[in-house]
């Protein structure tokens, strides 16, 4: 049960950090280049990979603390870090599967975003809900 609370607390910390970074990079208008998201995703990718592959955290760090750092803080801070870690892990074993996963992740994400956008626009125009 302790691990669930640690991950939850990490989630609060990670999402709060992401929000603070978005405030630091807010341009005052939308759309603008997503600098905050880029900063969060790139730093999260670095941090997750660093934490999981560093010998101390990999072999000696308490599993509850490791879960709080990775799943909690980094997981709520960004999901891109998880994607990049999985791509690296797949590349070590099966480059073809890594390419398929990467393409599915990118184009699947774009497709879901497009469908969400179109659905929201349709609802906003009264096409589904009146």
Can you name each region flagged by the protein language model?
Residues 1-130:
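Membrane-interface helix-loop junctions in multi-pass transporters/channels
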